[in-house]
């Protein structure tokens, strides 16, 4: 009896989530204009640039190595900053918990068009356990890597805003040109 009830409840859960259009977030569908681009960075083999490159590949973006090409869009990773602020302290005044902040600055250069700035900020908290000093360093490295991967995912998702702002700009230009043509 319990097995049938469990199967019924599981089936209802599947039907409800399928019926409402819920789906897990997969890879980002990058706009057609950005399916091929140049990835330009001051540290091309650094961990952040590698994370961005991996996210672009997961989104089926072809990365061109020739940074001098002017005919295809370019994603420039301008830089990143990591800060660490104290969130809480122990009774003896030592730091108990940090808030780590990673900010990534980038820009997209569209050939013959504008430069679109992108900024991504990722927050994480980190508990500083004074009894496990060696494990603390390893855990902090893992948290930093996860923050880089999350920032890279957000950066690739923000490429959609470049496409959206281009469409708005094109609509405004066509509206202005049709308004000027009707006045003439």
From Swiss-Prot:
- Segment forming the signal sequence: 1-19
Q: Where in the cell is it found?
A: Cell outer membrane
Q: Which UniProt keywords apply?
A: Cell outer membrane, Lipoprotein, Membrane, Palmitate, Signal
Q: What membrane topology is annotated for this entry?
A: Lipid-anchor
Do you know which Pfam families this protein is assigned to? LptE (PF04390)
What does the record give under GO molecular function? Answer: lipopolysaccharide binding
Q: Chief subcellular site?
A: membrane
Gene Ontology terms describing biological process = Gram-negative-bacterium-type cell outer membrane assembly; lipopolysaccharide transport
Q: Does the keyword Membrane apply?
A: yes
Tell me, what does this protein do in biology?
Together with LptD, is involved in the assembly of lipopolysaccharide (LPS) at the surface of the outer membrane. Required for the proper assembly of LptD. Binds LPS and may serve as the LPS recognition site at the outer membrane.
Q: Which NCBIfam families match?
A: PRK10796.1
**Family per similarity comment:** Belongs to the LptE lipoprotein family.
Assembly and interaction partners: Component of the lipopolysaccharide transport and assembly complex. Interacts with LptD.
This chain's protein is named: LPS-assembly lipoprotein LptE
Q: What is the lineage of its organism?
A: Bacteria, Pseudomonadati, Pseudomonadota, Gammaproteobacteria, Enterobacterales
List the gene name.
lptE
């Amino acid at each position: 009896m319990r097995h049938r009830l469990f199967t019924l409840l599981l089936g209802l859960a599947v039907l409800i989530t399928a019926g409402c259009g819920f789906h897990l977030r997969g890879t980002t569908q990058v706009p057609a204009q950005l399916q091929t681009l140049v990835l330009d960075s001051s540290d091309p083999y650094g961990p952040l640039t590698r994370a961005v490159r991996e996210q672009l590949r997961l989104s089926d973006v072809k990365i061109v190595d020739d940074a001098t090409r002017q005919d295809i869009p370019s994603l420039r990773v301008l830089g990143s900053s990591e800060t660490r602020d104290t969130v809480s302290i122990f009774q003896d005044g030592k730091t108990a918990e940090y808030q780590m902040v990673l900010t990534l600055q980038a820009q997209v250069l569209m050939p013959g068009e504008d430069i679109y700035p992108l900024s991504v900020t990722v927050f994480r908290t980190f508990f500083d356990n004074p009894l496990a000093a060696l494990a603390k360093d390893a855990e902090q490295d893992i948290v930093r890597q996860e923050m880089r991967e999350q920032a890279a995912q957000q950066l690739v998702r923000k490429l959609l805003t470049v496409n959206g702002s281009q469409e708005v700009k094109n609509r405004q230009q066509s509206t202005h040109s049709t308004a000027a043509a009707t006045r003439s």
